[in-house]
């Protein structure tokens, strides 16, 4: 029987340009950080990258064309397929666009923000 390896992943969203130094304590030892958008300022990502590699999607306050970040990201960790985006719901409803994307991608896990 193959032994499973546990990987810790830090998940964050909606930082809006703010970086709480406590993140360094919370994310100590993570293998990767997923940021689900509304980053706000590039230095937030730069500081997170000092902790672990970062995969990020742009949010509605992050002009995604200027940020260079995609609106949606799919990554794989072994057999786990992770979908990362910012806006999945609007007014308590899954958006039609998001529903199509999720139906097409069939992720195991979906990480999103914009829920505040």
Regions found by a protein language model. Give the residues of each.
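N-terminal active-site segment of His-dependent metallophosphoesterases
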Residues: 1-54, 62-71, 75-79
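Active-site glycine-centered loops adjacent to acidic/histidine catalytic or metal-binding residues
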Residues: 14, 38, 59, 86, ...
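Surface-exposed beta-strand edges and their flanking turn/coil or helix-capping segments
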Residues: 24-26, 69, 88, 96-99
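Short, surface-exposed loop/turn motifs that are enriched in glycine and acidic residues
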Residues: 34, 87-88
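Conserved beta-sheet core of the metallophosphoesterase superfamily
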Residues: 55, 90-116
């Amino acid at each position: 029987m193959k032994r499973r390896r546990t990987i810790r992943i830090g998940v964050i969203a909606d930082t809006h340009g703010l970086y709480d130094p406590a993140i360094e304590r919370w994310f100590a030892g993570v293998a990767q950080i997923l940021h689900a958008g509304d980053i706000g300022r590039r230095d937030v990502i730069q500081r997170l990258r000092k902790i672990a590699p970062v995969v990020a999607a742009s949010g509605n306050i992050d002009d995604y064309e200027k940020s260079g970040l995609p609106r949606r990201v799919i990554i794989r960790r072994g057999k786990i397929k992770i979908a990362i985006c910012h806006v999945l719901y609007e007014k308590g409803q899954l958006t039609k666009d998001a529903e199509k994307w999720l139906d097409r991608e069939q992720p195991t896990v979906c990480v999103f923000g914009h829920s505040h």
